[in-house]
Amino acid sequence: MTTHYIAGNWQAGQGETLQSLNPVTQAVIWQGQGADASQVDTAVQAARQAFPAWAQLSLEARIDVLEKFAAQLKVHAEAMAQCIGEETGKPLWESATEVTSMINKVAISVQSYRERTGEKSGPLADATAVLRHKPHGVVAVFGPYNFPGHLPNGHIVPALLAGNCVVFKPSELTPKVAELTVNCWIAAGLPAGVLNLVQGARETGVALAANPGIDGLFFTGSSRTGNLLHQQFAGRPDKILALEMGGNNPLVVDEVKDLDAAVYTIVQSAFISAGQRCTCARRLLVPQGAWGDALIARLVEVCKTITVGAFDEQPAPFMGSVISLQAARALLAAQVELAAKGGVKLLEMTQPQADAALLTPGIVDVTAVADRPDEEFFGPLLQVIRYGDFDAAIDEANNTQYGLAAGLLSDSRARYQYFWLRSRAGIVNWNKQLTGAASSAPFGGVGASGNHRASAYYAADYCAYPVASLETASLALPATLTPGVTL
């Protein structure tokens, strides 16, 4: 089966056998062999050969290809949404919004490039100061499974726009979405070698990250893998490394007037995408006392009614499945571990079908757990922590190695300003779900959550590097020579 797109040609893999399964039915929806190290190297060489011509194209010519790609996505939007839903398990309504985000990424990236990079100049007494930006060359893009179209797209589009060539390794759990995306690029007229697709799991990823022919690597995914990449790139300052990773995100709740609005925002923060967004709330900080008790009781009551089902089920469920049976089992095991440490299951997460990766929402009160794990439980598992005063809540919110997203639900602007100033996170929201983000804003965090602001408006910053120049059209002696020099 032809699973890799290298130098403008589809070819079969020579590495390990791979399968992609529908996470609910376990039906095989894609199969092939991963790329081995030699195929990865061929892909890198193809990108290197294509780089000079692609980089020398005018910006408008590259924009034209990107806009044709967006047009192809529109043509194939329904098929793309179906593919995303089938492979990830997310409901069709959510898959459709992902395709829309992919389409919109082109215009956002063009605007970002013009405003944050591009070319600027200013006159000096005897020359012109010019600032231009140059592409790095060949970059690797590693994509995640939770948004297999949108998140890799957030690296690939700005990278190509800046003049780079790309070797793309998607998650081994979502190869079909990657294949369909690359076909849209081919139909858009992208020249051979500018974008190369290598499918595979760990073996392929290690080979690509270690290949000396890449000039950088752009990664969105787990902190564990990102940390390994960071260690691997240590001592390689000549390589650009952009990491967007996960978070153990806190959502602090103040005593607000509208209890149901708070509950709805918590649900949208913790359980949308079956909890498989890197900005999902993992820790819910609730005040001690009667009001907090009422909030938790209402939250549990509402979460019991959340519908969970297959991606194409009608009427549409709020939550689809998690990515795989393995992921579902790991989350159930995490719930057991929290309970063993002293956590109280306020709402037990369950697996309605043993052979399907469907999970119901789980809520565990871990206030009494002394050694709470600072981990990202990537699914519908929410930990509740009760707090006595606002400063204690902020301290607990910051009690993590991560720093991706944090939020406050409060009727007080002064409290929010106090919270914002003390929060250690790259995204801080007020009375909005943690999973909400504007495409025109930077997306990313601090600490173990990453470095650059990947996959958003600020992606232009790491897709090209600035070059400062002093320029004049003719060479001439200055009117006054430097002391000590005679001509």
Curated annotation (Swiss-Prot):
Pathway(s) where this gene product acts: Amino-acid degradation; L-arginine degradation via AST pathway; L-glutamate and succinate from L-arginine: step 4/5
Protein's UniProt keywords contain NAD: yes
Family matches, as HAMAP family: Aldedh_AstD
Active site feature: E244, C278
Reactions this protein catalyses: N-succinyl-L-glutamate 5-semialdehyde + NAD(+) + H2O = N-succinyl-L-glutamate + NADH + 2 H(+)
Protein family: Belongs to the aldehyde dehydrogenase family. AstD subfamily.
NCBIfam families named among the record's database cross-references: arg_catab_astD, PRK09457.1
The protein's name in its UniProt record: N-succinylglutamate 5-semialdehyde dehydrogenase
Record-listed NAD(+) binding positions: G221, S222, S223, R224, T225, G226
Single GO MF descriptor: succinylglutamate-semialdehyde dehydrogenase activity
InterPro entries: Ald_DH/histidinol_DH, Ald_DH_C, Ald_DH_CS_CYS, Ald_DH_CS_GLU, Ald_DH_N, Aldehyde_DH_dom, SuccinylGlu_semiald_DH_AstD
EC top class named in words: oxidoreductase
Enzyme nomenclature, EC number: 1.2.1.71
CDD domains documented for this protein: ALDH_SGSD_AstD
Organism superkingdom: Bacteria
Keywords, alphabetical: Arginine metabolism, NAD, Oxidoreductase
GO aspect biological process, one term: arginine catabolic process to glutamate
SUPFAM superfamilies linked: ALDH-like
Function: Catalyzes the NAD-dependent reduction of succinylglutamate semialdehyde into succinylglutamate.
